[in-house]
Amino acid sequence: MTRDAKFSTSPISIRDKDYDFSLDLSYISIVEREPFCGTENESAMGHMNELSSLSSLFSDDDKKHTYFVAKIFPFSLKGEAKSWFNNSSPGSIDSPIGLVNVFFRKYFPASAQHAAL
């Protein structure tokens, strides 16, 4: 099923036939148990690593692996982080790498990146 982009409010707009798959509700349930809220004591890198680990259960294919992370990502947020995501411009994220970049820009700033090295 193809969605009409002009009616979509999601910041994620990946136009690739390989991205057109449904998520099993059990995966959504898993990520909703420990959501990322955007607080100072949370790790953006750790959150993305958890999503990546979960995606390895979904597929061995690298492309589908990254698409799974992008598809499950909105369900993994709560509180301020969910508000930030929902208030992002519709269609502004057009790839899994773009999603990671936007998320890290917000929750894993350059100063924290340098400290992690």
State the predicted function of each range.
Residues 1-117:
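Acidic, serine/threonine/proline- and glycine-enriched intrinsically disordered segments
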